[in-house]
């Protein structure tokens, strides 16, 4: 089953990544449900999916955030959307975190 169908917000993270923790903290503050996919190495099948979604870049940074299958970008991009007042609009209608 496609995870994007189950969770409209997907965040690809690395364990211990401070930017990943910061992005998740903002999503938690907004009280929206999201799917976190921890990607530990370039052999992980989730990385292949992510590279395909991002047109196969040579270098990936984390986190990578998708809302309704739209690539938002990373932590700074998420916070920029919030500062601009556009994040709440993107999150309208999203399931609330349990």
UniProtKB/Swiss-Prot annotation:
Q: Which residues form the Glutaredoxin domain?
A: 1-98
Q: Any idea which GO molecular function terms this record carries?
A: protein-disulfide reductase activity
Query: What do the Gene Ontology cellular component annotations say?
Result: cytoplasm
Gene3D superfamilies assigned: Glutaredoxin
Record's subcellular location: Cytoplasm
Q: What disulfide bonds does the UniProt entry report for this chain?
A: 17-20
Instruction: Provide the alphabetized UniProt keywords.
Output: Cytoplasm, Disulfide bond, Electron transport, Redox-active center, Transport
Q: What CDD domains does this protein's entry cite? A: GRX_GRXb_1_3_like
Q: Which residues form the signal peptide?
A: none
Q: Which PROSITE patterns match?
A: GLUTAREDOXIN_1 (PS00195), GLUTAREDOXIN_2 (PS51354)
Q: Pfam families per the record?
A: Glutaredoxin
GO biological process annotations for this chain's record? cell redox homeostasis
Quote the InterPro entries the UniProt record gives. GLR_AS, Glutaredoxin, Glutaredoxin_subgr, GRX_bact, Thioredoxin-like_sf
What does the sequence similarity comment in the record state about its family?
Belongs to the glutaredoxin family.
Tell me how this protein assembles.
Monomer.
Q: What biological function has been recorded for the protein in this entry?
A: Has a glutathione-disulfide oxidoreductase activity in the presence of NADPH and glutathione reductase. Reduces low molecular weight disulfides and proteins.
Q: What protein does this entry describe?
A: Glutaredoxin 1
Q: Which organism is it from?
A: Rickettsia bellii (strain RML369-C)
